[in-house]
Amino acid sequence: MNMEIKNILTLLMLCFSILIYGQWTDSATGRVNMTNEFNIYGLIGVIDLNIDSPSREVIGSSYVNENFLSGTISNREMVYSMRYNAYRDEMEIELQGKPFYLPKTNNYSINFDIINKEYQLLDYTENGESKKGFFVVLDKNDKTQLLIKESIKLYKEVPAKLGFTRYEPPKLGRLKDEIYIAKNNEAIKLPTKKKDILNFFSNKSKEIDLFAKKNKIGFKKTEDLIKIINYYNTLN
């Protein structure tokens, strides 16, 4: 048997083993074990079958982009249809026509080349609680990276007051994007005020302040923050 035929047979056996891998459903939790599907990608975990769709009465969307787009996981070759649920902070993947949540186990990236957008799953802290969440990479580099956190909030319904106000149904609305810094697989929220940002980079605050003044760069716009981070990376 020549090497080419042997490689083809090996590939077919791998595909077949993935297709027939035992998928079991726990009726109590509504979860499907798709672990073997992601062993190839180092994403070993359980994918949630239940996508929490808002009620029809809710106005708005859970998504920044509702469409499933072609993307890759950590730059692997296999392409999947995926979308980000900004209300649940979950990455949804479409498998055999059904949506699932990607497991939040090891940190990884999701690349949507068609829209030139990358999400990274990173550790972060919110209100004193350690979490894992998806962040959009604004500037890709091997050191400190600038990120944004996309969030959508559910606003509760407003009951009608007889003769005064109308009933307002619950609605989903996008919040202002928050700026984070990524370092060593952890996302850290960046302060909003110039003084606090300089203190954030305490060991290089003087150099950054001089750089910003010399180049007339502010501390509010994302394009200016990208320049500051790129300069900071040259100082390390």
Please annotate each region the language model reported.
Residues 27-30, 193, 221:
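Intrinsic-disorder/low-complexity, polar/charged segments
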Residues 1-27, 228:
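Bacterial Sec-dependent N-terminal signal peptides
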Residues 22-57:
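Sec-dependent signal peptide cleavage junction
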Residues 199-236:
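Long, compositionally biased interface segments
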Residues 170-214:
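An amphipathic alpha-helical core segment
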Residues 62-189:
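Aromatic-patch recognition
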Residues 19, 107-109, 196, 207:
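Exposed alpha-helical structural elements
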